[in-house]
């Protein structure tokens, strides 16, 4: 059953969710038929989701770029807000691919500010300088083709 449009996040609410939430979860297809679900730090720019990761996630996305990303917040049902993105992941294989991405500089600055201080405020936000290295450390740009959002705070009480 689809989520009624009146319960969806506005574009401003979606941006706020994506810019302030700490983790996303990405589901990719592992070897065979197993789904690999992993929490990761992320950036949001140009309607795309960016993350820097390694290992099985990169191997999975190279093999099959179809993935789903979930970003949500709050624990109690009446307060749940979130967004599910279905789409395709693009592994940025080298520094040239990173430099060619029009959002990469904004994402590096955003993620540096967001995560530089761990779970507290960073004394001095710094840019995320991570780049492709070795066989599996890569930036990934997730390009959504379908977005579903919800804001349970908008559900009217029965009665």
Please state what every model-predicted region is.
Residues 1-9, 78-159:
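Charged, gly/pro-rich active-site loop segments
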Residues 41-43, 62, 141:
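Well-ordered beta-strand positions
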């Amino acid at each position: 059953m689809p989520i009624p449009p009146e319960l969806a996040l506005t574009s401003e609410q979606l941006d706020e969710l994506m810019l302030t939430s700490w983790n996303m979860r990405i589901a990719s297809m592992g070897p065979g038929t197993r789904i690999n679900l992993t929490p990761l730090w992320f950036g949001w720019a140009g309607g795309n989701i960016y993350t820097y990761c390694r290992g099985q996630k990169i191997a999975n996305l190279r093999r099959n770029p179809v993935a789903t990303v979930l970003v949500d917040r709050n624990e109690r049902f009446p307060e749940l807000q979130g967004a599910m993105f279905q789409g395709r992941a693009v592994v940025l294989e080298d520094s040239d691919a990173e430099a060619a991405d029009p959002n990469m500089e904004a994402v590096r600055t955003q993620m540096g500010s967001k995560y530089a201080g761990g779970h507290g405020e960073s004394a001095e936000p710094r840019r995320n300088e991570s780049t492709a290295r070795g066989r599996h450390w890569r930036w990934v740009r997730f390009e959504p083709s379908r977005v579903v959002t919800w804001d349970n705070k908008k559900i009217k009480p029965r009665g």
